[in-house]
Every structure is written in C-alpha cells, then in structure tokens.
C-alpha cells in the first residue's frame, strides 16, 4: 500500500496536480480547448424549437469558406431558475446517430462541441427547406412546383430514408421543415432528435419523449394507438410530403387534441377524420389487424367515407397516373402493404421522363430566396449558469454583444 501511495504521489507531482493526479491534465485541456466563438463567427439566428436554437455561422479559419448551422441545446428550466441535469435524451440520440451516419441525403454533422453546460452540434448549412419552397410556390399566388423539380426532391428524400432504414434507423419526424436543400440542389434530411434504432424492441410513441411528432404526418397506425411500429411510419410521412409538394398545402391538416398528461394520450379524432375523408374509411378486409388497435372502437364510432384520393388528386391538377399510383402506395392504411423506401425508389414514376436529377434545381429558370436570418435574438445575448437567473451575462453568448453606448 505504501508503494502504491508513493507511486500515486510521484505521478501527481509529475503532472503538477497536487492531491488530484489529473488536475494538471484537466487544466491543460481547458486551456487548449477551442470554444464555439473561437472557431465560428455567428452570422445570425435561424430558428428555435423545443430542443433549443439554431444559428447560421461561418468558420474563422481563412481557408474554410463554408457556412454552417450550429444547433445549441438548451438546459432544462424550472421557473426562473435553470437546472443542468445533463444532456437530454434527444440530444444524446441525435449526436450518436449523426456521428455514425454518412449519406449524401442526410445532413452531415461536422463536429460536436461541449462547452460549460451547453452542447453544440455543428452541421453543414443548407440554404433552403421544403417548407420554404412550398411557401414560395403558394404565395402570393399558386405556382406549381415543376415536375422535374418535384420528382428529384421526392427521389432524394426516399434515397435518404432508404439509407436510414438500411441502417436500422427510424426518423419518426419527417416533415417539410425538417427536410433541407442546399444551394447545389442536394436534399438533406435533418433533425434526428426523435430518431430510433429499430433493431431493438420499440416502445410506444410517447414513451420517454417530450416532443410529439406533428400529427399532419403521423401514420394511421399511430393514431389508432399502435404500441410498436415499423419503418412504414416514415413512408407514410413521405407520402404526406409528396402530396403537399403537389397541392402546396398539407393533405391531412387536422387539429391536435392536447395531452392531459404523459400517460393519458387522447384519440386524435380530428386528424383521423381528415384522413378518412380523403382515403375513405379503413376496412378489415384491406387491413386485417385493424380491430386489434386500442382505438378501434373510437374509429368505429366515426362517420364512414368512400375512397376519394383520386378525386383529390384530380382537384389539385394531378394528371400523372404513375405519380398517383406511387402516392396511393405510400398512403396505404395497412403498414404491411405500404411501399418500402427501396421499392418506392424503383417505382416506374421515377423511370419515365422527366428523369430525376442529383440537383433538384437543375433546369430551373428562377432562384428561391435565401433563408431568412435574424440578427436579433434575446437568447443569444444571455448566459445561464446553475443557480443563476436568465439574463446574466457570460460565455454562453453565441452572438457578439452590441457595443454599449
């Protein structure tokens, strides 16, 4: 034991750490560690969500001309006080998955920076997203998205989803706002905070999740209370996005019934109503497991409708029959019959003219406006440490402070 103590003492003195043999090492690491603002210049604020905030930035390295999106995860708050209970489950999941995924149609994680009590994920920057593109084509007047653009967007989206599923990842939150497009016309699936590996037994949609997927893109099996689910939930969302690109508005725009608490999940009657008004009421002949869902009795109490998807397709000006066939296969009620991402990529819709392109903007005669960036954001002017109130100044400030007059 005495030899052990002498050895530890010698090691400690060698490191200059006194009683803590790793103190000097920790101090050296702290001195050499680059902070976010040491490496990046913040251009402006992009958006906020339940996870935190996203900023547009450029590298301070003169040899790096790229732009980046920096995602800052916020701390848990309780009233006016801020408590740091560690990194959230969503952040851990997104960091772990993004570090492993490598595909042209998945947003690339450049690096992760852990600084004081904040975690920052630095992603490649995309100038556009599908929500912005849809808005451009629907305001102030309706301008349909050209078929070659729409087809290329859909193909690249399916290609990214196929890659996720081949690597046993469910995205679970696909929607236009989470689907980016670079200035070079490359679609990027982003926001993997709700993604799950599906090689393990899956939990219910709400188990362990603070965030609930936007119901407009939620598959019917989830609305009916499915406890376990498959990659087919992502393909339903792709079908909804396809329809929205065609119509320039959500196909199933229901009103969400709010949860009273985490264990009492209400039946989303209005959302289900929007679906059956277009697809018709689901039947056990077409969906054998229908009666096994927890909300089956609630479904039986709803008014019945005949199938109306073809009429809806014609009402929005849809004329391509192969496009309609693909849409109807993505919006199958029975998840077992829904197309997989791989099968969808091989659909005849993509083999007929106009052919898909790796640049969704190819052949376009106009340019979409750049993403709106705000230089005013109260959060980036504040710093919070444990036991302090919001608004105190400190090193968490992502935006250079304005000079005091």
From Swiss-Prot:
Any one GO CC term of the record: CKM complex
Keyword hit for Secreted: no
Cross-referenced InterPro entries: CDK, Kinase-like_dom_sf, Prot_kinase_dom, Ser/Thr_kinase_AS
EC main group: transferase
GO terms, molecular function: ATP binding; cyclin-dependent protein serine/threonine kinase activity; metal ion binding; protein serine kinase activity; RNA polymerase II CTD heptapeptide repeat kinase activity
Subcellular location: Nucleus
Biased composition (Polar residues): 381-391
Active site feature: 173 (proton acceptor)
Domain Protein kinase stretches: 40-350
Keywords: Activator, ATP-binding, Kinase, Magnesium, Metal-binding, Nucleotide-binding, Nucleus, Repressor, Serine/threonine-protein kinase, Transcription, Transcription regulation, Transferase
Cofactor or coenzyme needed: Mg(2+)
PROSITE patterns assigned: PROTEIN_KINASE_DOM (PS50011), PROTEIN_KINASE_ST (PS00108)
Swiss-Prot/TrEMBL catalytic activity: L-seryl-[protein] + ATP = O-phospho-L-seryl-[protein] + ADP + H(+); L-threonyl-[protein] + ATP = O-phospho-L-threonyl-[protein] + ADP + H(+); [DNA-directed RNA polymerase] + ATP = phospho-[DNA-directed RNA polymerase] + ADP + H(+)
GO biological process: negative regulation of filamentous growth; negative regulation of transcription by RNA polymerase II; nuclear-transcribed mRNA catabolic process, non-stop decay; positive regulation of transcription by RNA polymerase II; protein destabilization
SUPFAM superfamilies: Protein kinase-like (PK-like)
EC number annotated for this UniProt entry: 2.7.11.22, 2.7.11.23
Subunit-structure text: Component of the srb8-11 complex, a regulatory module of the Mediator complex.
Function description: Component of the srb8-11 complex. The srb8-11 complex is a regulatory module of the Mediator complex which is itself dependent transcription. The srb8-11 complex may be involved in the transcriptional repression of a subset of genes regulated by Mediator. It may inhibit the association of the Mediator complex with RNA polymerase II to form the holoenzyme complex. The srb8-11 complex phosphorylates the C-terminal domain (CTD) of the largest subunit of RNA polymerase II.
Listed PANTHER family: CELL DIVISION PROTEIN KINASE, CYCLIN-DEPENDENT KINASE 8-RELATED
Name of the protein: Serine/threonine-protein kinase SSN3
Organism: Yarrowia lipolytica (strain CLIB 122 / E 150) (Yeast)
Name of the coding gene: SSN3
């Amino acid at each position: 034991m005495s030899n052990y103590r002498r050895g530890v003492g010698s090691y400690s003195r060698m490191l200059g750490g006194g009683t803590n043999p790793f103190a000097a090492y920790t101090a050296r690491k702290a001195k050499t560690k680059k902070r976010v603002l040491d490496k990046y210049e913040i251009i402006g604020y992009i958006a906020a969500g339940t996870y935190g905030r996203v900023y547009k930035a450029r590298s301070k390295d003169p040899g790096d001309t790229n732009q980046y999106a920096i995602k800052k995860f916020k701390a848990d708050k309780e009233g006016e006080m801020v408590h740091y209970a560690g990194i959230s489950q969503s952040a851990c999941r997104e960091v772990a998955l993004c570090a492993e995924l490598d595909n042209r149609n998945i947003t690339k994680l450049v690096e992760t920076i852990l600084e004081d009590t904040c975690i920052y994920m630095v992603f490649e920057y995309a100038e556009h997203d599908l929500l912005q593109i849809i808005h451009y084509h629907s305001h102030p007047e309706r301008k349909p998205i050209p078929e070659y653009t729409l087809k290329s967007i859909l193909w690249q989206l399916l290609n990214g989803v196929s890659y996720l599923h081949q690597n046993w990842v469910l995205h679970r939150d696909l929607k236009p706002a989470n689907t980016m497009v670079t200035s070079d016309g490359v679609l990027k699936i982003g926001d993997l905070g709700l993604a799950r590996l599906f090689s393990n037994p899956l939990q219910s949609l709400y188990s362990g999740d603070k965030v609930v997927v936007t119901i407009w893109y939620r598959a019917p099996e989830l609305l009916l209370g499915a406890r376990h689910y498959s990659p087919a939930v992502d393909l339903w969302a792709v079908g909804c996005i396809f329809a929205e690109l065609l119509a320039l508005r959500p196909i199933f725009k229901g009103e969400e019934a709010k949860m009273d608490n985490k264990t009492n999940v209400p039946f989303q009657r209005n959302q289900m109503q929007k679906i059956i008004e277009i697809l018709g009421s689901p039947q056990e002949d077409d969906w054998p497991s229908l009666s096994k869902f927890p909300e089956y009795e609630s479904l039986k109490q709803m008014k019945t409708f005949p199938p109306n998807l073809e009429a809806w397709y014609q009402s929005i000006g849809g004329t391509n029959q192969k496009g309609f066939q693909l849409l109807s296969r993505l919006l199958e009620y029975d998840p077992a019959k829904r197309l997989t991402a791989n099968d969808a990529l091989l659909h005849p819709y993509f083999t007929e003219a106009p052919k898909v392109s790796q640049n969704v903007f190819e052949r376009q005669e106009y340019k979409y406006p750049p993403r709106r960036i705000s230089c005013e954001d109260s959060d980036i002017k504040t710093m919070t440490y444990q036991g302090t109130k919001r608004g105190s100044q400190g090193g968490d400030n992502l935006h250079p402070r304005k000079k005091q007059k």
